[in-house]
Amino acid sequence: MTETSTSLKPLIAFKQSYPIERLWVGLHLALLVATSCLANWPPDKQSVDTKLQKLESSASKHRFVSAPFTPETPTAWPEPHVNSHEDSDVPCQVIDPGISEVWEISSRHMADRFGCINPLNPGLSAKRYTSTGWQPQALDDALISDDRLVIIYVHGNFMETNNALDRALILNKYLSQRSQIPYRLLMLSWPSAREPHPLRDVYENAQSAECQALFVGWLLDKLHDHPNVSLLGFSFGARAVTGGLHLNAGGIIPGFQYIRLSDGPKAPDRYRVALVAPALDRDWLAPTGKHAQALNHVSGLVNLYNSRDPILRRFRFIDRLSRPVAAGFAGFIGLQGLEGVSNPRATGPLATTSKIRQFDCGSGIGTTHSEKSYYAQCPYFNVVIDHLLGQETNAKPVESTVSF
């Protein structure tokens, strides 16, 4: 046996012979930890109010998911949010009202989790982008019935207000570049800002995104007479889109109470839908899925996914009981024309049907969950744009020329 090192003998003797000194050292370390904790006390009033609001809103008894999923590396999360327009990566835009209108329909001032809304007054606020910036305007002005195409866009997770507004302008640049008709872009801006606890935020924002389905359903109800409506959802925003379509078609989501204002659109198969990196279970749109009726009034669905997505690769941790696979990681299955995919965890190439087109952007954008990477680097994003605009004859995968 190797002889004990001379340098370790005093430490061993200390542990064996001086229990009181060991206790004193332990108490001293505990005091240091307590002191460092008290150094940050008390928190400011705003943080206290924010936590109280979260506690009150979390009193809902509805169950949506059971556990968060984690990123592969700390840098795998989306890029940091923008706190001011001075830090924005979007230059000032001059929007021609004859071509496009850009609106923010916001629920950020409301509770982030809820089970019902007042269909006569849901409490949403509206802003329109003008030559002088974002200006408050009446919500009814955004929902007027005219001949403009209406595109409802729901952003993803970890988006502060300014970041979401900038994202709407980025999307508008792609749309206006290719559009042949006037359109009105309505972004549903929901409470999804990054908080100090990112893992808990993922869990909570997954619930919040599902609650936004009530607002998407309400918007579709208000636009039921409108002749031309498209929807786009990114990441968690896709939950709100498919959930809203499901509710609008008469479907029920456990834990939600939704009162429809109409019987749905007058014309069947009228909505065009596109999802980018959808953070929802790949079988939710199947006949037995949670949003089974989402495609009842949809003429076509385009899904862009990434089989190399480092975030959605861990999507199974969002519910440790069902261990779901994200449609944004492996595409949707169980739908008409896709019944042959019996293994929900299979990630092989998917067939294209007359109603559903799915494209893997992994080879183009690599290991990322960035929305802007899909827009700028996925060769199929122009298929999404032309699908939303109803310009299917132009829907060919080509490289974008938009720059920032």
Language-model-derived ranges and their functions:
Residues 1-8:
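Short, intrinsically disordered terminal tails adjacent to the first/last structured region
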Residues 9-27:
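Bacterial N-terminal signal peptides that target proteins for export
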Residues 26-35:
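Bacterial N-terminal signal peptides
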Residues 38-40:
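Bacterial signal peptide processing site
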Residues 42-140, 144, 157-159, 165, ...:
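Lipolytic serine-hydrolase domain surface
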Residues 148-156:
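Short beta-strand element of the alpha/beta-hydrolase
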Residues 233, 237, 241:
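Gly/Ala-rich beta-loop-alpha elbow adjacent to hydrolase catalytic centers
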